[in-house]
Amino acid sequence: MTDRANEAVSHLFETFGEKIVETGYHGSIPLITLTPEHLPAVASHICHAPSLRGTLSLQWAVDLRPVIQRFQLFYLFSLAEDGSWLLLTTHLDGSARIYPSITPRVHAAKWYEREIRDLFGLIAQGHPDLRRLVRHEHWPRGTHPLKKEFAWNQVMGRQEGIYHYRRMEGEGVFEVPVGPIHAGIIEPGHFRFSVAGEPVRQLEIRHFWKHRGVEKLFENLTLTNGPALAEKVSGDASYSHSLCY
């Protein structure tokens, strides 16, 4: 742990005191455990306190069942100045599936919390936009592919549905759709521009057209067989994905 990270943990203890359940490490990264209701305040403080000025770099969930009846949430922050890492975590026990959203205070969490809802069925209460992100509208209701009970070879049905794009209206405003099919090896992506002449007034992006259960396939592979699958995740990132794996 760097001196900067050590100072950050001490600062959070001084500020939030008993709201912090415990501290530890995830590898060499400081790990602070909180109850769900205190997440928004602590996450916001990390991002906006002048002495910290952290950036939310990643947010993810883990389904620990059947070993423990628990879902665990992680929030990885990079601190200003030296880029030290700081990790927050909380958990939902038993049948709990709702946790407080940090998006209203930390806007970078917006897509992460939507993705977690789609893949795990965990709902970020207070999120301003819980439209589907990874699960496109044809996915059956209640289908969450990273829950432990979802089998890697499960055949899903298909339902009809419409994705409601955000609309911008006004004199001289036009929508310009681009994609999802593009030339070359670039992955599919739909970009919907709202323009008024040359200025772009709004852009809405839809990705995840090729979600195909890769995470579940990894669960069934040995460590040595994983790189071959990692290379196939994305056509324009085969080397970087296998290297990270």
Name each region found by the language model.
Residues M1-L203:
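Terminal low-complexity/charged segments
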Residues F174, V178-Y245:
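Active-site- and interface-proximal helix/loop "cap" or "latch" segments in soluble metabolic
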